[in-house]
């Protein structure tokens, strides 16, 4: 089922999400299926449960190709419960981000370039991976939703925040 995606200004996006406590349940599997369907419908590269009003530490991400990020390399399809992120260096990298909860806007956001992330898959099996570049950016962006943070709060220079159609007139106007 496709869910409505909450938009910036909705107080539910500012909450700290609760940990997933029960794995491998029909409810969790149905939620994950709904999240993937919602993400695909919105042409997203990731989605956090709080974005559809579900107060759980659950994120999904991954794509082969995405019109919203045409130059981005593929990111493996991942389901991550109760994620933890560890920067593997102090190196930060600025990159343009958008968000399904902040439609039509883009901002230049600093993120750690190289991270390790861990958590659990839907069956409760531990996952641990390293990521860099755009993959690392997507993980950090989605996990921010679990602590009630949206990317505009990370922007250092607000002259690098605006409407996608103005900042990137060459992009498909339906991409955000």
Curated annotation (Swiss-Prot):
GO terms for biological process: co-translational protein modification; translation. InterPro entries: Peptide_deformylase, Peptide_deformylase_sf. Binds 1 Fe(2+) ion. Keywords: Hydrolase, Iron, Metal-binding, Protein biosynthesis. Its EC number is 3.5.1.88. Fe cation binds at residues 99, 141, 145. SUPFAM superfamilies: Peptide deformylase. The keyword Chaperone does not apply. It catalyses: N-terminal N-formyl-L-methionyl-[peptide] + H2O = N-terminal L-methionyl-[peptide] + formate. GO terms for molecular function: metal ion binding; peptide deformylase activity. It is an enzyme of class 3 (hydrolase). The keyword Metal-binding applies. Its cofactor is Fe(2+). The active site is at 142. Pfam families: Pep_deformylase (PF01327). It comes from the Bacteria. HAMAP family: Pep_deformylase (MF_00163). Removes the formyl group from the N-terminal Met of newly synthesized proteins. Requires at least a dipeptide for an efficient rate of reaction. N-terminal L-methionine is a prerequisite for activity but the enzyme has broad specificity at other positions. Belongs to the polypeptide deformylase family. This is Peptide deformylase 1. It comes from Bordetella pertussis (strain Tohama I / ATCC BAA-589 / NCTC 13251). The lineage of its organism: Bacteria, Pseudomonadati, Pseudomonadota, Betaproteobacteria, Burkholderiales. The gene is def1.
């Amino acid at each position: 089922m496709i869910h409505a995606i909450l938009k910036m200004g909705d107080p539910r996006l500012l909450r700290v999400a609760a940990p997933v406590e029960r794995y491998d349940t029909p409810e969790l599997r149905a939620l994950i299926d709904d999240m993937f369907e919602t993400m695909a419908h919105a042409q997203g590269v990731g989605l956090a449960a709080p974005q559809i009003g579900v107060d759980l530490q659950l994120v999904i991400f991954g794509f082969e190709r995405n019109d919203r990020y045409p130059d981005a390399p593929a990111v493996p399809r991942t389901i991550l419960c109760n994620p933890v992120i560890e920067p593997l260096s102090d190196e930060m990298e600025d990159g343009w981000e958008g968000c399904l909860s902040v439609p039509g806007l883009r901002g230049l956001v600093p993120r750690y370039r190289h991270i390790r992330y861990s958590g659990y898959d839907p069956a409760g099996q531990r996952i641990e991976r390293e990521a860099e570049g755009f993959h690392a950016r997507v993980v950090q962006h989605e996990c921010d939703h679990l602590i009630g943070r949206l990317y505009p709060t990370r922007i250092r220079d607000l002259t690098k925040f605006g409407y996608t159609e103005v900042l990137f007139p060459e992009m498909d106007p339906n991409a955000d």
